[in-house]
Amino acid sequence: MANCSQEELDEEFEQFMKELSDDSFENSDKTARQSKKEMKKKDTVPWWITEDDFKDDGLLGTNVSYLKTKKTSQPVMEIEEESAEKIQFLKSSGTSLLSTDSLETNELVVSELNHSSLGVGLDTLEEQEEKEQFFARLEKGLTSSIDYSRLNKELDSNDSTHFKALHSNQANAELTDDEHENESKHEELAENYSDDFEDEYVGAPLTTKDEEMPSKENSKSEKISVPKQEEEKTGMLANVVLLDSLDSVAEVNLDEQDKITPKPRCLPEMTENEMTGTGVSYGQSSSDVEALHQAYCHIAHSLGDEDKQKIESNTVEDIKSSVKGHPQENEENSKNISTMESDLPTVEELMKPIRIDSFGISGFDLQPVSSEKVAERKETEFFSSLPLKMNPNILSQDSQHVNLFFDKNDENVILQKTTNESMENSCPQVTEVTATEEHVDKMYLNILRKKITVNSSSLSQDDKINKTYRSQLSSEEEGAVMGKQVPYKKARSAPPLLKRKPQSGLYASVRSSGYGKPSSPLKMFSTLEKKTSEDIIKSKNLRSISTSNQPRKKEILSGTKLIKPAALDKPAHKTESCLSTRKKSENPTETDSCIQFQTDSLGYCGENKEKKLLMFKRVQEAEDKWRGAQALIEQIKATFSEKEKELENKLEELKKQQEKELFKLNQDNYILQAKLSSFEETNKKQRWLHFGEAADPVTGEKLKQIQKEIQEQETLLQGYQQENERLYNQVKDLQEQNKKNEERMFKENQSLFSEVASLKEQMHKSRFLSQVVEDSEPTRNQNFTDLLAELRMAQKEKDSLLEDIKRLKQDKQALEVDFEKMKKERDQAKDQIAYVTGEKLYEIKILEETHKQEISRLQKRLQWYAENQELLDKDALRLREANEEIEKLKLEIEKLKAESGNPSIRQKIRLKDKAADAKKIQDLERQVKEMEGILKRRYPNSLPALILAASAAGDTVDKNTVEFMEKRIKKLEADLEGKDEDAKKSLRTMEQQFQKMKIQYEQRLEQQEQLLACKLNQHDSPRIKALEKELDDIKEAHQITVRNLEAEIDVLKHQNAELDVKKNDKDDEDFQSIEFQVEQAHAKAKLVRLNEELAAKKREIQDLSKTVERLQKDRRMMLSNQNSKGREEMSAKRAKKDVLHSSKGNANSFPGTLDSKLYQPHTFTDSHVSEVLQENYRLKNELEGLISEKNELKMKSEAVMNQFENSMRRVKEDTAAHIASLKASHQREIEKLLCQNAVENSSSKVAELNRKIATQEVLIRHFQSQVNELQSKQESLVVSEVREEILQKEITKLLEELREAKENHTPEMKHFVGLEKKIKQMEMRHAQREQELQQIIQQTHQVVETEQNKEVEKWKRLAQLKNRELEKFRTELDSILDVLRELHRQGVVVPVAFADEMNAPEY
């Protein structure tokens, strides 16, 4: 066994684990083989890692769930290659887990643990027994005496289990109550969960493999709605359900399939068991079960498998989403069971066809008593013809039935229909409840008025209504008895029912898509339960069902139960709204006509007024009572909802606290489990490794320690189990409190519904009384009143049409006026656009020109910058090279310093090198001489000998000179290039400075102009305005005086004309005296003088206007403002025109006075002399008065002229002073500008000098740095010289000591000393030769330098000559360019030479 492989060990370990879980032992062979593949993929993962890390693991565990996932988890994707193996593995290993009953949860937990990966907590048999006892106690505790079935019945308004059962396949219809007896049957369906392992999944069959992928896709869409509190991982205990319901697990998958494939399809006949799901209710509400599930989801962390946590969390997530999405399905089971032993139908079975949640078309159920079986058939047709996706046939059928009901005058049906419609619209949206109730109230009132006004055609209908009313009362009593009998019975498991009859009708097989959002019972409780009692009364009113007809009634109910609340989806809303609008559109017309008829009949018949008034009062009182009751109901509902919310909040808080505590406990559990698993792994490894060997005492001790630790862990686990039990008891207590509260609220709600029902009965009674009173009225005046109503309507229509015509005419006129305005505005806009476009074009042209100029200028600047950049690049290169050379020289200096550090070594090296060189030179010279001797001996007159002789003579000198000259030329070329570049740089700097100066100058000019403009505006504007005002005042005064004088002259002319007529008459009759003639002459003279004065004044005014114009021109010139210039010119022109007009008027206003009238001799022929004398005297008096007036006027005009002259003089003086001050300021500004210009122009020279100074300073700094370097070198040289002297002294001392030592030694030493002396002599000779050579070299250097200096001077002269020539050439070019500019300015065209003429060769 020690040599066993790991796989065999794993197999044996798996068998051991299977033996612990009783059920899975049978299939251990299969799991042993297939777990090899699976276990390799699985690794233990700690609890804090999210499920996203398991994406690539495929199906991770045995108990695979295909339900909705959590927010954090990704949907588990199937791999096709491994799917068959994994399904087989599921069948082999997971059957026992999924097929066991909920009473065997201890085995479930153990198998869950045993299926974990290697080393995740092993449970002992003692633990298993404790768990069995614990869960048995829990299940016993669940069967409490509290009956929750009644609450589930009454609160649930959405009966969706039947509908979902219809969607299931026929293969799954074999699940009945005996499915818990045989485990083999469950093993056949091992892919799916058993009914007992889910809590809130109800009424759907098990899912197959085909449904796996759609469910996974839909699980993605449901991730968002999952709250964050559910993100903790859940174990296998999430699947443990304590016999709450035997509903199927795969409910959610059906919903998801419905969502994916919402198209209706034909369904087979179903048994009663299929219709009702599993059909068993254990009295738990959805909220209690949800709380229990949350508690067990968190407890299961301690027992969960780490590799299967993902799948298990998916299942729990689906539980919770199903609780939210389908909270009514659990409660539907309890309703379906109700009372199977008794033959009597329950309240729920009677209420089902009338409920609002059965598509809200319950009103169609209410047929008249006369129609029996036909009505039943039609009823089933109505119910079957209203699925989600309505056909046009269905709508037409519905509308036909609606018309049929209206034709029969069945008001109750209409009333029920409208109420159902309004409440059906309120079902999907709870917020519209109050609005729908108000709508129902209005419809009630309309129908009551209609009842009061409309005359019933026959008394037979009234008799029928009375009969139905009596039968209603009797059936109400029956229903009350039944309601008392039924709700308090405990729910029991129903036996399998007989097969029901299939639905009759055209659309019986059409199903709903089922993806609607069903409304929760908490929200819809108040609105739906309110209508139930009302609907019971009405259905019993019209049907009057007796106990003998109960079998038939059950058949009808079996047909109507198939209608689901999933119809509250959007398509259904559309169809219902269509129906309701049609019905509403029909009702108001009837009520309006009835009201009209009522008013006419009241006006015509005075007999029934008192009765009608009494009926009205009664109806109003009933309405008031009803409204008061409704207000009370609303208040009670509000309080009820508030209490509900408070309770919910408390429950949520408690749940949160419990979840936190459970989470902590789970964490602790997990840590302890991890420790246990590690201990167990080590224990197992040691056991298998040391198997077969002698047991050491050490291993025994270790085993004891491990057992102790295991016992401690077991005690801890027992403590945790006790804590879990305590928490579970708390949860149970809270649920019981919640149930009690719900029962209390339910009772209150029932009492309120009973009050509403009593109020409605009173309403019905009052309505029937009013109908009885109306039936007795005569019907003879109906046609007459109809005709009167038609007449009045026609007159009203005629008046309204006339008013419309008038209004339309007025509108037409207003529109015409607007149209004209728009036309004018359009023309103005066109003119304005034309004007603006012209101006804009001109502005655009100007802008284009300025832009072109700017572009050219910028291009020049760019070119200049590019050239400048090239120069800078060259300088940078040169700098780099210089830096490199400096670095090289520094390195050489360092080397030399290092070498010069020890001069004695250097001297020795030098001496050795010199000796070796001398020997080599001697050898080479000797060889050369020998070779030359051989050549001479062999070929005395040959070319090589001659060449040697010539080369020995003068080749060396020529070569040296040529090389020297070449070097010199290169050096000079380099200098010239450097000078050229320097010249370019200087030019660039000059250009830069010039541009800078130019920009500064321009900026300065702009600033000065701005300052000038500001100053002129500040100083001149008030003065000029004052002058302009004075001028305007003077002009106005002058014009007034001129007008007055013209008026006076006209008067005088008129008088003169009269006097001339009289004078002519008197001359004819010789009554004219000498005095009169004298006076006339005086008057003429005065008139002439006045005319002359007027002309002089006009001249003066013209002069003044000219001076004003001149002043204005001067001001315009000074301000240089174009806008003001135009304005002043216009004013000047106007002044001139005024003067001209006035002069013309004066010239024309004085025609010839004497020559204007002709002589008429017969005017005074018949007049008497005395009359003539009287007339003459009167005229004399008048003339004197006129003369005096004229004198006064003359005095006035003179005074006015004096004033005018004074004012003009003052104006002239002021303007002269102002002009003088302006000229002075202008002069000052010009001087300032000149000074600035001179300073700026002179500053260019200053800048040059400054530049030279800067260059000199740079040179001085450079020389100073060189001097400093030399000084430092000098100091180092002094130090080195001192060091050399000391060393020399030491050497001399040592040499003397050596000599003394040598003298004291053998003759060999003497010989050595002699050789040394010879060497010294030879060195001395060598030094002398070197000195001579140095002298020769210095002499040659001096000669070369002199020649170089001469060459440099010569090249300098040449360069200066070239520069002068260039300057001359530039000046000539400038002059030529100036001439060309002048010619171009004058318009002379200069002929340009062609390229071939320019390039023609010269001979």
From Swiss-Prot:
GO CC field: axonemal microtubule; centriolar satellite; centriole; centrosome; ciliary basal body; cytosol; Golgi apparatus; intracellular membrane-bounded organelle
Superkingdom as given in the UniProt entry: Eukaryota
Basic and acidic residues bias (residue ranges): 208-231
Function per UniProt: Required to promote assembly of the transition zone in primary cilia. Acts by specifically recognizing and binding the axonemal microtubule. Localizes to the distal ends of centrioles before ciliogenesis and directly binds to axonemal microtubule, thereby promoting and restricting transition zone formation specifically at the cilia base. Required to mediate CEP290 association with microtubules.
Species for this entry: Homo sapiens (Human)
Disordered as annotated region, ranges: 18-42, 170-231, 476-504
Modified-residue entries (Phosphoserine), positions: 157, 160, 474-475
GO biological process, one term: cilium assembly
Keyword Nucleus belongs to the record: yes
Subunit text: Interacts with CEP290. Interacts with CPNE4. Interacts with alpha-tubulin.
Subcellular location: Cytoplasm, Cytoskeleton, Microtubule organizing center, Centrosome, Centriole; Cytoplasm, Cytoskeleton, Spindle; Nucleus
Coiled coil regions, renumbered to chain: 617-670, 698-1121, 1171-1206, 1235-1386
Protein name (database record): Centrosomal protein of 162 kDa
Family recorded in the similarity comment: Belongs to the CEP162 family.
Basic residues composition bias: residue spans: 487-502
Further information: Promotes ectopic assembly of transition zone components at cilia tips when targeted outside distal ends of centrioles, generating extra-long cilia with strikingly swollen tips.
Chief place of localization: cytoplasm
Record PANTHER family: CENTROSOMAL PROTEIN OF 162 KDA
Keywords attached to this entry: Cilium biogenesis/degradation, Coiled coil, Cytoplasm, Cytoskeleton, Microtubule, Nucleus, Phosphoprotein
